[in-house]
Every structure is written in structure tokens, then in C-alpha cells.
Amino acid sequence: MEQLWANKYRPQTFDELVGGAKELDYLTQSMQHLLLHSRGAGRGKTTLAHVIAKELDYTIHTFNASSKKTRGIAFVEEELIPLTSSGNRNQIILLDEADQLTPEAQSALKGVIENAHGYFILACNDISKVSDWIKSRCLQIHFLPIGKEAMKERLEYICGAEGVVITYSQLNLICEAHEGDLRNAINALQAFAS
């Protein structure tokens, strides 16, 4: 089975990031807990977390809080507390879909974040579901939709790398249909090419 292009062409460095995210390279100079948020998927939140980890040569532990297993207090107590108590300061704990954590789990995170060895990066689509306490302890970065020109540029790069011939109007349609969600636009391009 062919690799998804969204994964194959996922940026590995700040220079490869699309849109405003590439301006965030200063984050590696003074690492802190981060809360990355947007009003939609495919904006680069998770990718930014992985780029930061790679640039700092930190281990990254990724958890998706949208599953029943990882959104409750048991997950915080059984997984996160031991992980952040390990003494490894060169690690990032990425909680994707952090807005799906239960209020109890978010409350339990309070002590974990305060005493963590390493750094938390929380990514979410609905910041209103994240507790005020977490918001106050993290640098908040809002991700805007990826601009149409930046999307086109990235899709054109992928077309060149994959040998895909596409018209300007077809490329435009893909960008317009996916309104700032680069991941879905790349998936649509791959479907078009196959």
C-alpha cells in the first residue's frame, strides 16, 4: 500500500513548515509548555510539535485524547504521571485533541504540568473546552487556516516530486474545497493522482 502523501511530505524542519508556523522557530530558544489551537484540523499543530522535538533532539510521546482510554483521569494517573516523573527533561508530551480531555483529567493535569520533567504541548480545535488553569500555564498559539497561496505552493511542490500533471484550475479547486486544511488538500491531491 502506498504511503499517504500527507505523511510522506510532512515538514521535518521549520523551513519546511507552511504559513505562519515557520515563524515560530524562536520556540526552541526558550522551550515552555504550549497550547496550540485552531478552529479546524490540518493547520500544522501536531506537525509543529514534532518539528520542535526534532530541532531540540527531544523524545516526543504522542497521545490522542479523543479516545475513551486517553481522555480520563486514569490516563493522567497511570500514563502521564510516571512518564513525567522519569527524570527525563529532554522530552515532550504531546496531547493531541486536548479539548477532549474530561474536566477531571484536566484538573489532574494541574500537578502533572507543574512538576513535569519535560514539556507539554497540548493541541486542540476548541480552546473553549480547555480549562482556564491550563490556558494560564501554557504559551497559547492560535493557528489560522493555511492561506490558499501557501497551500498551492506546497501542492505544486508535491506534484513535482511525484510527477503529477495538474492544471492550475484543478489545483485551485482542491485548495478552495479544503479551506485551509492542508492535510485534507494533500489527501485530495493524492486521490486525484491515483
Go through each PLM region and give its residues.
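P-loop/Walker A NTP-binding region and its immediately flanking N-terminal helices
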Residues: M1-A150, I158-G160, Y168-E176, N184-Q190
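Loop-to-helix "switch" segment enriched in basic
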Residues: S194
